[in-house]
């Protein structure tokens, strides 16, 4: 697990949607990695993040609604709980990502 303030970057040559860009990891908890793309507001209309667990990927709104993919009920429940705890931080991170600025690390689920 990373310490607060440290951003990990997914080094895959192309993202889940075939976009060739780095996708910073903004949080991680219970084996779930949370990522945000810079300038990703053009691909999905709603503010969102990408989640990965056990080789599966999904896209969630900042309120925890799954809009693409499926991570199963346990991971989805944990993500919804995390969104409720960290709503303001998610909004700040989304604004930074949409503007192409440094995306802050968001504390994991407690």
Which residues does each PLM region occupy?
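C-terminal structural segments of small proteins and small subunits
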Residues: 78-110
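Generic secondary-structure boundary/loop-capping signal
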Residues: 23-26, 57-59, 64, 68, ...
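A short, structured beta-strand/loop element
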Residues: 37-75
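Intrinsic disorder/low-complexity segments
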Residues: 5-9, 23, 34, 55, ...
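Intrinsically disordered, low-complexity and often Lys/Arg-enriched segments
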Residues: 1-25, 108-110
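Short, charged/polar N-terminal "headpieces" of proteins
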Residues: 15-45
């Amino acid at each position: 697990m990373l310490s607060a303030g440290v951003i990990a970057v997914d080094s895959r040559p192309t993202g889940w949607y075939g976009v060739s860009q780095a996708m910073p990891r903004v949080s991680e908890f219970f084996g779930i990695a949370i990522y945000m793309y810079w300038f990703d507001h053009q691909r999905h209309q709603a503010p969102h993040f990408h989640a990965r667990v056990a080789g599966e990927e999904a896209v969630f709104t900042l309120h925890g609604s799954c809009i693409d993919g499926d991570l199963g009920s346990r991971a989805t429940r944990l993500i919804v709980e995390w969104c409720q705890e960290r709503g303001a931080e998610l909004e700040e991170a989304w604004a930074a990502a949409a503007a192409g600025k440094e995306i802050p690390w968001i504390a994991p689920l407690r």
